[in-house]
């Protein structure tokens, strides 16, 4: 056990996905597959109280282009002082990006905009540096855009372009794994970290403490952290248990 404890730690980001004012989880990113878990402010406060250093906060309505939850996101961030927030969903222009940073997001994930508006993405990557991550949402090696409803190009071509732009960090999601509780796509993560020196955050599929241990094995290769969603909400394990396995 001591050998395991000497390994570098994996940063865990409990997820709070917001749709129609409620904390929800989707299955494979599909609109209409929501399971509701109540008030997002309460959910975020619960993870903060349980020891979270980061929360991955997602505005699903903004991601799907059906309005937004800006006021509610601001409340979530205000109620979780001391916890760093990675904010995602519908960040597609200067207004949405600046608003996310103004309300207290530590880091903002670009998704669709990085695929559909590469010049703008390159500009803000250069301007904001570490405050920008790019979400690479993948089916096979094809990227998914617009709330995962459209194809967004070849993963490796887009990654090469983002590397040239100086992207500071990538959040890699296997869409087929997300919310399915079937384990993360370790092979995909290994392939991505082989192609970048930048840190990678893994997302999608974590179902057990063994999955967290397996992801921790990849930290030395470049996997910095992991987003944990449905497994926490469904009670597969507690956040303190997960943080312990992750090395906190």
UniProtKB/Swiss-Prot annotation:
GO terms for molecular function: 1-(5-phosphoribosyl)-5-[(5-phosphoribosylamino)methylideneamino]imidazole-4-carboxamide isomerase activity; phosphoribosylanthranilate isomerase activity. Its EC number is 5.3.1.16. It catalyses: 1-(5-phospho-beta-D-ribosyl)-5-[(5-phospho-beta-D-ribosylamino)methylideneamino]imidazole-4-carboxamide = 5-[(5-phospho-1-deoxy-D-ribulos-1-ylimino)methylamino]-1-(5-phospho-beta-D-ribosyl)imidazole-4-carboxamide. It is found in: Cytoplasm. One of its GO terms (biological process) is L-tryptophan biosynthetic process. CDD domains: HisA. The active site is at 17 (proton acceptor), 137 (proton donor). InterPro entries: Aldolase_TIM (IPR013785), His_biosynth (IPR006062), HisA/PriA_Actinobacteria (IPR010188), Isoase_HisA-like (IPR044524), Isoase_HisA-like_bact (IPR023016), RibuloseP-bd_barrel (IPR011060). Pathway: Amino-acid biosynthesis; L-histidine biosynthesis; L-histidine from 5-phospho-alpha-D-ribose 1-diphosphate: step 4/9. Belongs to the HisA/HisF family. PANTHER family: 1-(5-PHOSPHORIBOSYL)-5-[(5-PHOSPHORIBOSYLAMINO)METHYLIDENEAMINO] IMIDAZOLE-4-CARBOXAMIDE ISOMERASE. HAMAP family: HisA. This is 1-(5-phosphoribosyl)-5-[(5-phosphoribosylamino)methylideneamino] imidazole-4-carboxamide isomerase. It comes from Leifsonia xyli subsp. xyli (strain CTCB07). The gene is hisA.
